[in-house]
Swiss-Prot record:
Keyword Electron transport (UniProt): no
Positions annotated to bind Fe cation: 160, 162, 213
Lineage, highest ranks first: Bacteria, Pseudomonadati, Pseudomonadota, Gammaproteobacteria, Enterobacterales
Gene Ontology molecular function, alphabetical: dioxygenase activity; L-ascorbic acid binding; metal ion binding
Family label: Belongs to the iron/ascorbate-dependent oxidoreductase family.
Annotated catalysed reactions: 3(1)-hydroxy-L-isoleucine + 2-oxoglutarate + O2 = (4S)-3(1),4-dihydroxy-L-isoleucine + succinate + CO2
Pfam families documented for this protein: 2OG-Fe_Oxy_2 (PF10014)
Identification of the protein by name: 3(1)-hydroxy-L-isoleucine 4-dioxygenase
Length: 247
């Protein structure tokens, strides 16, 4: 974990392979069927998301916030209004938005809990934004759903920084007919430092405020039907800033 926290601190981002999460003790199941059952339950959460009514892009969304108390206990709900600033997202900044609350079947899911707890530990190891019990923690489920003639894309659609101090992007599923969905890292709007793709289950990109980032629009291969990209964003923000991540 420390190598990823160090890379985040020095480079402004880190790529964490999905194998890292799958090798953690919390993901060691007594048999493969139990793991697959948990994964199937997690994926079902994407069937109950809301098509984003606040901006175009064919993105389906669900949302929750998480609090960690001094005893280490986690609670989930909507504790603060979900709003972005115009400075970071000129498209929908300063608009309070509401999305379906993620159900307990998701927030109690063992695989989701493993991702969340590991992210909490990495932010603690990062040591640059304070203890996690002093931060606003956002959980965003996103489905990018594209067809041949209707791509799916983020907001803002190009290089940007987020309101949040640290953002994790976890890959859950990408359909084989998907085009695009590449992550870009940049030091300057006219200079791309790295292009990478989250492909395998739990492949993760984590970014801070030091670098710009973007994800390229998602499309579908010709005559292949809809293409989907399902991700989980887990965001961490100092409480003096009451805004949330533009995606």
């Amino acid at each position: 974990m420390m190598e990823y926290a160090t890379h985040l601190s020095r480079q402004g981002y880190a790529f964490i392979p999905g194998d890292y999460y799958r090798s953690t003790e919390a993901m060691q199941f007594s048999n493969k069927e139990d793991f697959l059952d948990e994964l199937e339950e997690l994926k079902k959460g994407y069937e109950n998301l809301l098509l984003d009514p606040y901006s175009p892009g064919n993105r389906w969304r669900g949302y929750a916030q998480c609090k960690k108390n001094e005893k280490g206990e986690l609670t989930f709900g909507k504790f603060n209004p979900y709003k972005q600033t115009k400075a970071f997202n000129p498209d929908t900044g300063d608009i309070i938005r509401d999305y379906p609350l993620l159900p307990e079947a998701i927030t109690r899911n063992r695989l989701f809990q493993t991702l969340l707890h590991d992210d909490l530990s990495l932010v603690d190891a990062y040591e640059s934004i304070g203890p996690v019990d002093s931060l606003t923690i956002g959980i965003h489920f996103f489905r990018y759903q594209a067809t041949e003639n209707e791509p799916a894309y983020s907001s803002p659609v190009w290089l940007h920084k987020d309101d949040e101090d640290v953002v994790f992007v976890h890959m859950i599923n990408a359909s084989p007919n998907m085009l695009g969905g590449d992550s870009l890292i940049a030091s300057h709007p006219r200079s791309i430092d790295r292009v990478l793709r989250l492909e395998q289950l739990f492949d993760t990109l984590v970014v801070n405020h030091d670098k710009l980032h973007a994800v390229t629009p998602v499309g579908a291969r010709e005559n292949s039907g809809p293409a989907q990209r399902d991700i989980i964003l887990i965001t961490f923000q100092k409480n003096e800033e009451k805004t949330a991540c533009p995606v």
